[in-house]
Amino acid sequence: MRYQNMFETLKKHEKMAFIPFVTLGDPNYEWSFEIIKTLIISGVSALELGFAFSDPVADGITIQVSHLRALKHASMAKNFQLLRAVRDYNPHIPIGLLAYANLIFSYGVDGFYAQIKECGVDSVLIADMPLIEKELVIKSAQKHQIKQIFIASPNASSKDLEQVATHSQGYIYTLARSGVTGASRILENDASAIIKTLKAFSPTPALLGFGISQKEHITNAKGMGADGVICGSALVKIIEENLNDENAMLEKIKGFIGGMIF
């Protein structure tokens, strides 16, 4: 219900969803919690939180390095502990997880979904799991009332987009371009055709990700028919550039979010 409530409220005010991505435990768990609290205070619509992984193939260099920073002290137990703390801090904001398949399967699929439900998580996106393998997780997601998110890519066939639209719950992660994550000066591709196709198959909101780093990108995304954006690399870059000064980091994050939300 948290995603539904969020999108309904945004629609009433004719606003776009702005969802930041950060890696849990980057640069450490204490700062990570402060970063997430700053994001919430700054007025983000929802959270997309990553589990650090040694081989994050869908990510560009900025987020790869954030995984490496977090991996110095990361553990599944600490990730779950931080998720619980975030949920206790704010009972209303939707919390999405972005994880790589290996982490989920090595933990045990059903156990993982049961655990994140207990932590107050709302959705999961598995970065490197193709749609064809959805049956491996979908039963556990439904059983534990976790919304499973799937990715709509620019080169997907109409049939694949129909599958993505039909099976995604909460929202659909729509790629602004193919390749890996990373901030861009301009949005290279027009995703309006993909978004239009998705909306023909399902009313599930479509969020645009990959390359979102400026306010004008959000305006462009709105023009393409997107219901919101996911922003990761530009935000993670601020963390990377302020590792020696927590206060400066939090202030810059606040300023960045303030400049992006409208």
Swiss-Prot record:
Active-site residues, record numbering mapped to chain: E48 (proton acceptor), D59 (proton acceptor)
Alphabetical keyword list: Amino-acid biosynthesis, Aromatic amino acid biosynthesis, Lyase, Tryptophan biosynthesis
Catalytic activity annotation: (1S,2R)-1-C-(indol-3-yl)glycerol 3-phosphate + L-serine = D-glyceraldehyde 3-phosphate + L-tryptophan + H2O
Pfam families reported in the protein's UniProt record: Trp_syntA (PF00290)
GO CC terms of this entry: cytosol
Disulfide bond residue pairs: none
Gene Ontology terms, MF aspect: tryptophan synthase activity
Pathway the protein contributes to: Amino-acid biosynthesis; L-tryptophan biosynthesis; L-tryptophan from chorismate: step 5/5
EC number(s) recorded for this UniProt protein: 4.2.1.20
Keyword Ligase set for record: no
Role: The alpha subunit is responsible for the aldol cleavage of indoleglycerol phosphate to indole and glyceraldehyde 3-phosphate.
UniProt similarity note: Belongs to the TrpA family.
Assembly: Tetramer of two alpha and two beta chains.
PANTHER family: TRYPTOPHAN SYNTHASE ALPHA CHAIN, CHLOROPLASTIC, TRYPTOPHAN SYNTHASE, ALPHA CHAIN
Protein name: Tryptophan synthase alpha chain
Organism of derivation: Helicobacter pylori (strain G27)
